[in-house]
Regions:
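Bacterial Sec-dependent N-terminal signal peptides
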Residues: 1-22
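Extracytoplasmic
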Residues: 33-37, 54-56, 62-64, 83-85, ...
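Mid-domain, small-residue-enriched loop/turn segments at the edges of structured enzyme/sensor domains
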Residues: 133-194
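Conserved catalytic neighborhood of penicillin-recognizing serine enzymes
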Residues: 95-133
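Acidic helix-start/capping segments at beta-turn-to-alpha-helix junctions
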Residues: 84-103, 139-140, 206
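Active-site SXXK
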Residues: 48, 60-90, 123, 261
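Beta-lactamase-like hydrolase cores
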Residues: 17-57
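Structured C-terminal helix/loop/strand segments within mature extracytoplasmic catalytic/sensor domains
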Residues: 21-33, 137-138, 142-143, 184, ...
Length: 293
């Protein structure tokens, strides 16, 4: 009986390894011909099944850091130092031109109030760069975020610059992390180990409401799939090189499991449409693997 059980367990392990090998091969085929350095980290939260390719790639964060900033902000909400209902005065001079800012577009004259809830939604759901910097100023700067993320046990994470300070090519590479570190923070966030239950649910939902990157990871998943994610993208330099394009998040599959997918592309010379499709294809392959097991 013991021998039969052992044989069965070996069979199950072999099936898992074979399946992962198939997914790994498909992902490697997707990224093999791309003119970019690509890092991928995947984890099924419920089964703990993991896979990574270049998971330790040190990659520019870009606007992915708005997730980490939101975590640090909501930690202060949990502690009672901030409230989602509190009003924050937005000065006109804080609404900088020549940057992505739905707040500025909607309130071009500034000098008005937004609640912290509104500011977080603009920043996380709609990637507002001015909103991001206003949040950072409110919570004490990048140092607050760095210390908080490190306190969660995440070591491969660096944040030193706000959006306004990321104006030069070299500056794009200063704020950085790895696919594996991103998957790790997303997992403990989802499990409620970073924030209280109410603020965890709140942040997850405003990530589901993300309006950016519709043709990226989201395009590789079936319509209607629950996806909580954040995107990040840099400009190009004079040599048509893009420093980074990233999409990280958690999606729910039909059996109720949740899959973390962290995709970072670095030093890209492909056209944007090609890079978007690469991320979508990675998401599609991951979805197919976990829904056909």
């Amino acid at each position: 009986m013991r021998r039969i059980l052992l044989t069965f367990l070996i069979f199950l392990v072999s099936l898992k390894i074979f399946g992962q090998t198939e997914l790994r091969q498909e992902l490697e085929n997707i990224i093999a011909t791309k003119n970019a350095t690509i890092g991928i980290s995947i984890k099924n939260i419920e089964t703990k099944d993991t896979l990574s390719i270049n998971g330790t790639l040190n990659a520019p964060l870009m606007s992915i850091f708005k997730f980490h900033i939101a975590l640090a902000t909501l930690n202060l909400v949990d502690k009672g130092k901030l409230s989602l209902k509190q009003k924050i005065f937005i000065k006109k001079e804080e609404l900088h031109e020549n940057t992505w800012s739905p707040i500025r577009d909607e309130y071009p004259n500034g000098n008005m109030y937004l609640t912290l809830d509104q500011l977080l939604r603009y920043t996380v759901s709609h990637s507002d760069n001015n909103g991001c910097d206003i949040l950072l100023k409110l919570i004490g700067g990048t140092e607050t975020v760095q210390l908080f993320i490190n306190k969660q046990g995440i070591k491969d994470f660096t944040i030193k610059l706000n959006e306004r300070e990321m104006q030069t090519w070299e500056s794009f590479y200063i704020n950085s992390t790895t696919p594996l570190a991103t998957t790790e923070i997303l997992e403990i966030f989802y499990k409620g180990q970073v924030l209280k239950k109410k603020t965890t649910k709140y942040l997850y939902q405003i990530m589901v409401d993300c309006s950016r990157g519709i043709t990226w990871m989201k395009a590789g998943l079936p319509e209607g799939t629950e996806l909580a994610h954040r995107t990040g993208i840099s400009d190009r330099n004079e040599n048509n090189l893009r420093a980074a394009m990233n999409d990280v998040g958690i999606f729910k599959i039909p059996n109720g499991n949740h899959i973390i997918l962290s995709v970072y592309l670095k030093n890209i010379t492909e056209e944007r449409e090609v890079t978007e499709k690469t991320i979508a294809d990675i998401a599609k392959a991951t979805w197919n693997y976990y829904t056909n097991k």
